[in-house]
Regions:
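Short, small/polar-rich loop/turn modules that mediate ligand/substrate recognition or access, typified
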Residues: 180, 185, 248-250
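Substrate-binding pocket helix/loop in short-chain dehydrogenase/reductase
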Residues: 103-104, 111-113, 214, 218
Length: 265
């Protein structure tokens, strides 16, 4: 008996290419290991295929789907395809996100709008299509992946990303209250500094490609002395997706090794 037997999980940003575990890949694989059928969505076929193949190799059930979740028509088609394949959606994981550097002065309006689309609008669109399904089923769990950048300054000039992730948390909380009496729960997992394949790209953007130095600085910023990893995020997601958290809604689980409670940034 697994914690998610018989449930269907739609995971956006599920993909991962090459070695290492990103949040989306770890979340998708862990949900499948706990019995969920995973409808894995990513912007590229190769990224989604990598994750879905891992699930199938372990004996789980997964179907991949390619979509840009900032586009309303593609989101509607994505949800329709999931329903045609599985007939229900019990769990929605909104895991897409992207960070670009910049302050209000030097960031272009185009970059600002793109950041809002990826980090906030995507979750708005998926909720718009999935919440009526969950309500009709009598329940469901939505877990949105935010960031400590939405809670406090996180050491990098990323004003749009920070604003977007803060907005995502408020979108989650407000919608959770609206849907509480309808049996649908919405919560956020809020990762801190995580050692995932994404860190190499962040080092290029924020540390002139000095990967080792960037990683060392991030480890030192965390009170526990190290960054977390994708499995720390995935385990928090699993709890919120499962019936073990049935009385928890409109909340944030911060997974950061004490970072946001410290002054170490």
């Amino acid at each position: 008996m697994h914690r998610l037997d018989g449930k269907v999980a739609l995971v956006t940003g599920c993909g991962g290419i090459g070695l290492g575990w990103g949040n989306g890949k770890a979340i998708s694989v862990l949900l499948a290991r706990q019995g969920a059928s995973v409808f894995g969505v990513d912007l590229t076929h190769a990224a989604a295929e990598t994750t879905c193949n891992l699930i199938r190799e372990e004996g789980g059930t997964a179907q991949l789907h390619v979509a840009d979740v900032t586009r309303a028509a593609q989101v509607r088609a994505m949800v329709e395809t999931c329903m045609e394949r599985f007939g229900r959606i019990d769990i929605l994981i909104n895991n897409v996100g992207r960070s670009e550097p910049g302050s209000p002065v030097d960031m272009t309006e185009e970059t600002w709008n793109e950041q809002m689309d990826v980090n906030v609008k995507s979750a708005f669109l998926t909720c718009k299509s999935v919440l009526p399904i969950m309500e009709a089923q009598g329940g469901g769990s939505v877990v949105n992946i935010s960031s400590v950048a939405g809670l406090r300054y996180a050491g990098k000039p990323q004003v749009a990303y920070a604003a977007g992730k803060a907005a995502l948390m408020q979108l989650t909380q407000t919608t959770a209250v609206i849907y509480a009496a309808r049996g649908v729960r919405l919560n956020c997992v809020v990762p801190g500094l995580m050692l995932t394949p994404l860190v190499e790209r962040l080092a290029d953007k924020y540390a002139n490609g000095d990967f080792q130095g960037f990683v060392a600085r991030r480890h030192k910023q965390v009170p526990m002395g190290r960054m977390g990893d994708a499995w720390d995020v995935a385990n928090a997601v699993l709890f919120l997706a499962s019936d073990e958290s049935r009385y928890i809604t409109a909340q944030q689980i911060v997974v950061d090794g004490g970072l946001t409670a410290s002054t170490g940034l």
